[in-house]
Amino acid sequence: MEIKRFGRIREVIPLPPLTEIQVESYKKALQADVPPEKRENVGIQAAFKETFPIEEGDKGKGGLVLDFLEYRIGDPPFSQDECREKDLTYQAPLYARLQLIHKDTGLIKEDEVFLGHLPLMTEDGSFIINGADRVIVSQIHRSPGVYFTPDPARPGRYIASIIPLPKRGPWIDLEVEASGVVTMKVNKRKFPLVLLLRVLGYDQETLVRELSAYGDLVQGLLDEAVLAMRPEEAMVRLFTLLRPGDPPKKDKALAYLFGLLADPKRYDLGEAGRYKAEEKLGVGLSGRTLVRFEDGEFKDEVFLPTLRYLFALTAGVPGHEVDDIDHLGNRRIRTVGELMADQFRVGLARLARGVRERMVMGSPDTLTPAKLVNSRPLEAALREFFSRSQLSQFKDETNPLSSLRHKRRISALGPGGLTRERAGFDVRDVHRTHYGRICPVETPEGANIGLITSLAAYARVDALGFIRTPYRRVKNGVVTEEVVYMTASEEDRYTIAQANTPLEGDRIATDRVVARRRGEPVIVAPEEVEFMDVSPKQVFSLNTNLIPFLEHDDANRALMGSNMQTQAVPLIRAQAPVVMTGLEERVVRDSLAALYAEEDGEVVKVDGTRIAVRYEDGRLVEHPLRRYARSNQGTAFDQRPRVRVGQRVKKGDLLADGPASEEGFLALGQNVLVAIMPFDGYNFEDAIVISEELLKRDFYTSIHIERYEIEARDTKLGPERITRDIPHLSEAALRDLDEEGIVRIGAEVKPGDILVGRTSFKGEQEPSPEERLLRSIFGEKARDVKDTSLRVPPGEGGIVVGRLRLRRGDPGVELKPGVREVVRVFVAQKRKLQVGDKLANRHGNKGVVAKILPVEDMPHLPDGTPVDVILNPLGVPSRMNLGQILETHLGLAGYFLGQRYISPVFDGATEPEIKELLAEAFNLYFGKRQGEGFGVDKREKEVLARAEKLGLVSPGKSPEEQLKELFDLGKVVLYDGRTGEPFEGPIVVGQMFIMKLYHMVEDKMHARSTGPYSLITQQPLGGKAQFGGQRFGEMEVWALEAYGAAHTLQEMLTIKSDDIEGRNAAYQAIIKGEDVPEPSVPESFRVLVKELQALALDVQTLDEKDNPVDIFEGLASKR
């Protein structure tokens, strides 16, 4: 099929790798393939360097030191597929070469020590933890550094905050009090800053000289009594203020202050904090602490420059300004590598504590590095992070786009971050610095709005964690090929033009240019422009960039369209959209859902399970295909060959399509012929009418695979057994089980059918003499077992497509304590579209299928072509998502011309271009009509006459010309399939791309007749998972009261709910065909009485004659 490209803006640079934020970050943290001597001081290398050397405490017997030399990462013991199958973690062993040094004897023992396992990242950027694919979401937080903010309590005053890395030191606030005294607040204690400045060696003369420009403010800082002290005295005085309970000793004070401000192991601004502090204060720092300790004295790094800036800000000196904490120059991303390294550091600190204890306890002569180190604390810390952290999430694998989006998510929640309840509007809002860095459209709709966002398409995260976006350099009005990646802070210094600025060659073509400076729009001469956007795509995330004509959609609906694409279910007959945006191929390629050729070569073998290619370098590579694998969300992951034997392939050519891809293009739904018109109220309120033909052609059929699992345990009564020998079951019920009691592959199973047979021993009383006799004759066989088999849950079923049996003792199998074996059965369902399923397009138009019409009843074109879907026109104006109408018009042209289109966002097809294509399509369509011998009939002319009155067509023109005018508007005359008559007015018809979403009615439909009850309230449980009932709430009670339906209401509140005795009596009566008796007391009333009695209130129930009634009488025996 021919692909026609729109778009006038040349792509200067390709998109960066889409999973780079995950893959590169983790690679850098591990540095597994870097020789030890060339490793940078980042990630786990930095964690080792910070923790080691570990020295024996003061109380030690002789001085022992454990030092670190290098580490290496071994090979993973199991493949990724084995890990998924056996519920293992995809990980590799970590070894460290350590030295134990005896200080007094100089003896050195060296050893390679096993430090546990380190989870490895798969090539697509996710992890396999306990058999499940997981993603570590990047976290955005306030960067460490020095910040100046207005004091909310006192206008015109400011607070300077010095913020370290999370959990790597205290926050420090400096402020000028109302009295003029400059105070410092640390660990919730406030003291005059001059005290610390004296400890740092400043005297009155120096302070006056350094701060002479701020006369009045300096007077509030100076305290002659303090400045007359020696630094050591000031240090002890400061220590007594910070630790009032501790004895004021010089050595204690020194150790405390060193740990608080100068110890690199306990206080750390981080590289990003150091960079931000230097940038803000205009000074160079020697390290990442606030104070350095040299020759027994403290030397200031940060405090005086911070104070100078605070004074300048208070005095209103130009060039000094407060910080915007939501500016992306002040917020940074903590990627997976940093998050893991932080946790690794925590684990190493616990390990070091254990090492110190063993140094003290053990004999120095017999100790070795291996005896000192216990790897458990480190492994536990990593396990905790990967399996339980708020940022470690179950991977969304609904379709390839979902998994890619999940890896590019940025969350402000999580440890050290915000909470939903505390986050205000400012932090959630779109900020001007989001431009090209964080998508302004894609974010969840609920409580997490604005807290969870997505990385923009071209954005990259730099080594310090700041998000950079690319710009082309402009010199004297000429756009160069030089591309510069800039942080938000750097961008604020320049004037930047938009990507769609008109160019003649490389020169800006207009004499005035719309540009922006610090986020504000300005109109400037071409010579003033310093940079230019690389592409309109750079503003939005991947999902949003997949919406054609995005510029015509309201942002609220674009948000829904972005989010709903990730909920699209892969269909068995996937179709790429007729109207694309140009990113569809790249998404499939970077998600690794499809298979591509590694080099140039020739295909030598193709079958349903593998593709073999002989590459030109002589290698014969077999590429295995994943067929009908279950994704985390239960959708089918299936790869289908797209090459033939003997076919020549080039490097990067498509070998096999993955789920939701067609010829390597993302294919989340189907292109269907849509009419936008009301239809007898069946499409009221976003409901959708579809043609039965879609079901016949399997257009919206998807495969879903459910996983069922059962364990056989060792119990106190005896072991549970997986067996076919189940008591009290007919042979018919067991017909699909093999001799081991597991259902065969290919069997069709329905609700209640047995998947895995299991028997468990019954709990029993003391056996009777007769039973004991039988047991002695027949052995243990007579002991009673009960059927505890795994059955298909209500409302589920399908075809058994896989089974797996894991036994304790099998290689690589790790089962929970007490579990002897686990059996898993995979059941696949082929789901056709049905009434109640949710459909949506890319523009945020979503609805539920309300009616499936026979194809003969669907509206049809004059040539008899029936439409596939009828959408309500009222779904468009109020939602303001007109992009879908333009897509439909362009789709109509594509339908007749047999073309596909690429229309990039903010640079797509214009109205004149669409009209031109529609004119071409009309000539083809009408020429075909005339060729088949039918022109414009009488009924069509009536519709045209009405259209003329509405001003849709020009009066006085021939019917053919009027039809062409309508076609230029994307409208045609449509006939009612039920009556054969045309509808009154012309109707918009065209191809629209519509997806079936994960919210399928089959998963939500639920009915209960008899089921489980809650133990305390004796009311039916709630929800489909518990096989619960429908809640009859207070509003439903009001409805029955309003109707006066007293008996129905009484039944609802008693025997249908929690009246145990009444329930049983009613059951008996129905069986015997008698009248249902009067209800008794509901259990919830008894619970209420008991709760009141528990509050020491005397509650009595009386009859009409005030005689006491015991509502608990005989209850124990009846239960």
Swiss-Prot record:
One of its GO terms (cellular component) is DNA-directed RNA polymerase complex. GO terms for molecular function: DNA binding; DNA-directed RNA polymerase activity; ribonucleoside binding. One of its GO terms (biological process) is DNA-templated transcription. InterPro entries: DNA-dir_RNA_pol_bsu_ext_1_sf, DNA-dir_RNA_pol_bsu_external_1, DNA-dir_RNA_pol_su2, DNA-dir_RNAP_su2_dom, DNA-dir_RNAP_su2_hyb_sf, RNA_pol_bsu_bac, RNA_pol_bsu_CS, RNA_pol_bsu_protrusion. It holds the Pfam family RNA_pol_Rpb2_7. Keywords: DNA-directed RNA polymerase, Nucleotidyltransferase, Transcription, Transferase. It comes from the Bacteria. It catalyses: RNA(n) + a ribonucleoside 5'-triphosphate = RNA(n+1) + diphosphate. Coiled coil: none annotated. Its EC number is 2.7.7.6. PROSITE patterns: RNA_POL_BETA. The RNAP catalytic core consists of 2 alpha, 1 beta, 1 beta' and 1 omega subunit. When a sigma factor is associated with the core the holoenzyme is formed, which can initiate transcription. DNA-dependent RNA polymerase catalyzes the transcription of DNA into RNA using the four ribonucleoside triphosphates as substrates. Belongs to the RNA polymerase beta chain family. This is DNA-directed RNA polymerase subunit beta.
